[in-house]
């Protein structure tokens, strides 16, 4: 499982295993331009909604919102120089273009005052240094993807087992942060990360408060990884008194070389965000199963439920559920082709159909991505 390898290798992308050797290794020679790496990814897809919505829109989806239309999801170019030796400076910049960029663009950068994102984005841009304290204290400053959640925004170094994204990914947690984060490997089993940022998906802060994120990562074995996240801070415009808080739990367990399990749970609330000025709450859980069938073939299943008690996250008070079946084939070492058979269910009639709104939404999708 791609996500499992990322988590188990470092208990989230910010907790690099290179930190464990940072103190013992001598400083790396400054190789200048030769040390800079270039990577990339191209993802394209097609989705068909069996409800036949007149607007040709898949309701409540994160990225796969276009019905009956071929789409360029994202083109990504990453330029980076990893830092691993004490006091060695590094950086990473992710340039993206496509439909994904329009959704995840941060306010204050490629999202205008009306809230409309553009088809280009500076997905990540940060500088890094490893301070020679203990096993190595890693410091990152700039813009980076969130450390919350089981699923990721697809990139050259990580993508999900399912082609579509969960409700938890889209509505329970943020996409990116801009600020400062420090991470430290206490032992091969326990890692920590602390971040202070402007907020959720903001390059320019919308109030005078800051958002704080604490992460604990546990890797009891090479096959099991558990991440606990807590994030809190004011996120409303010109309001630093009312906080948004989320507790996020992620676990992956590789039972065998062919069978992997995953879990994600989120519990969130926000003061003064419910109708009437009360506290809004949302929660959900998702389960994942991936089975390597044979050779380049694999099959993944995701099932989840998400309760938006007050409608603060989806716009209407409802409980959403979905199940997704994803067959996959790898064409060589750089190309992945995935199908996506998905059924969304709500306790409210929120899904557009040919003659009105329904409580279910079945879709069929295909996705191809190439990375280097």
Protein language model annotation of sequence segments:
Residues 40, 44, 72, 76-81, ...:
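Residues on the lipid-exposed face of transmembrane beta-strands in outer-membrane beta-barrel proteins
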Residues 33, 82-86, 132-135, 146, ...:
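Outer-membrane beta-barrel channels and translocator barrels
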Residues 61-64, 101-104, 110-116, 224-372:
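Outer-membrane beta-barrel pore domains
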Residues 63-100:
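Glycine- and aromatic-enriched membrane insertion/assembly motifs of diderm outer-membrane
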Residues 30-58, 70, 91, 224, ...:
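Transmembrane beta-strand segments of Gram-negative outer membrane beta-barrel proteins
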Residues 14-21:
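C-terminal segment of classical bacterial N-terminal signal peptides
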Residues 48-70, 100-217, 227-234:
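Surface-exposed coil loops of outer-membrane beta-barrel proteins
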Residues 43-47, 94-98, 144-146, 195-200, ...:
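Outer-membrane beta-barrel pore domains and translocons
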């Amino acid at each position: 499982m791609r996500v499992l390898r990322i988590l188990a290798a470092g208990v989230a992308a910010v907790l690099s295993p290179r930190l464990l050797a940072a103190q013992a290794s001598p400083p790396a020679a400054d190789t200048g331009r030769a040390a800079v790496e270039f990577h990339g990814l191209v993802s394209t897809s097609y989705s068909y909604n069996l409800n036949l919505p007149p607007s040709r829109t898949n309701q409540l989806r994160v990225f796969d919102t276009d019905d009956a239309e071929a789409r360029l999801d994202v083109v990504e170019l990453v330029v980076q120089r990893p830092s691993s030796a004490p006091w060695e400076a590094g950086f990473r910049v992710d340039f993206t273009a496509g439909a994904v960029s329009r959704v995840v663009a941060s306010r204050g950068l490629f999202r205008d005052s009306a809230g409309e994102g553009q088809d280009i984005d500076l997905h990540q841009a940060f500088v890094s240094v490893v301070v020679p304290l203990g096993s190595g204290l890693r410091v990152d400053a700039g813009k980076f993807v969130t450390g919350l959640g089981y699923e990721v925004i697809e990139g050259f170094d990580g993508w999900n087992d399912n082609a579509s994204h969960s409700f938890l990914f889209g509505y329970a947690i943020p996409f990116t942060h801009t600020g400062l984060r420090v991470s430290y490997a206490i032992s091969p089993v326990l890692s920590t990360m602390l971040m202070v940022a402007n907020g959720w998906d903001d390059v320019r802060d919308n109030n005078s408060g800051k958002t704080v994120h604490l992460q604990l990562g546990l890797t009891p074995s090479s096959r099991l990884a558990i991440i606990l996240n807590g994030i809190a801070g004011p996120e409303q415009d010109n309001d630093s008194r009312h906080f948004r808080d989320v507790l996020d739990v992620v676990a992956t367990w590789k039972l065998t070389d062919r069978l992997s399990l995953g879990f994600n749970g989120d519990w969130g609330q926000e003061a003064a965000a419910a109708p009437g000025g009360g506290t809004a709450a949302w929660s959900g859980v998702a389960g994942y199963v991936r089975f390597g069938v044979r050779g380049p073939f694999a099959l993944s299943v995701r099932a989840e439920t998400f309760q938006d008690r007050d409608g603060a996250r989806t716009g209407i008070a409802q409980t959403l559920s979905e199940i997704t079946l994803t067959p996959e084939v790898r064409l060589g070492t750089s190309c992945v082709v995935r199908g996506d058979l998905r059924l969304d269910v709500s306790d409210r009639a929120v899904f557009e159909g040919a003659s009105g709104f329904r409580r279910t939404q079945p879709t069929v999708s295909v996705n191809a991505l190439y990375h280097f």
